[in-house]
Amino acid sequence: MIIYRDCISQDEMFSDIYKITEVANGLCLEVEGKMVSRKEGEIDEALIGGNASADGPEDCTEATVITGVDIVMNHHLQETSFTKESYKKYIKDYMKSIKARLEESKPERVKPFMTGAAEQVKHILGNFKNYQFFVGENMNPDGMVGLLDFREDGVTPYMIFFKDGLEMEKC
């Protein structure tokens, strides 16, 4: 399994159990999720390879059911909010941080990143009202903000992450 971490906060943002597509000329990763309902404290068996029928009967106790997007719930992402103006300030500072990291580690990515990022930010601001914003579990204000939107069907959630702001970790 591959875990994708925010390169600034080191928070786990998502893993390769989801359908991942490069978008915006390879600048971003689009991660498709699904809406799920879980009892509070319950672990999704798909994540651990469990089999409920083999584990024996479950205790019947009242439990709180939580419904949400699997990417958000599985990786403990925290919702945050922005106005258009506050997002512009955040993204400007975030782009500077990523540019500095790229200059050190992958100088050949700086120009394509900065050019593509400007276009992507325009697209994000143009569709600003469609997005919900999520940060990693530690809620680092300098870290990556994932954008949650829904497909045209209104049912299928997907998140967008800047690829150059992620580190991959094999588990």
From Swiss-Prot:
Tissue expression profile of the protein: Expressed by the venom gland.
InterPro entries for this protein: Mss4-like_sf, Mss4/transl-control_tumour, TCTP, Translation_control_tumour_CS, Translational_control_tumour_p
A GO term for molecular function: calcium ion binding
SUPFAM superfamilies the UniProt entry points to: Mss4-like
One matching Pfam family: TCTP
Subcellular location: Secreted
TCTP domain boundaries: 1-171
Gene Ontology cellular component list: cytoplasm; extracellular region
Keywords: Secreted
Family: Belongs to the TCTP family.
Note: Secretion of this protein from cells may proceed via an ER/Golgi-independent pathway, probably mediated by secreted vesicles called exosomes.
Function text: Venom protein that causes edema, enhances vascular permeability and is likely related to the inflammatory activity of the venom.
Name by which UniProt lists this protein: Translationally-controlled tumor protein homolog
Organism: Micrurus fulvius (Eastern coral snake)
Phylogenetic placement of the source organism: Eukaryota, Metazoa, Chordata, Craniata, Vertebrata
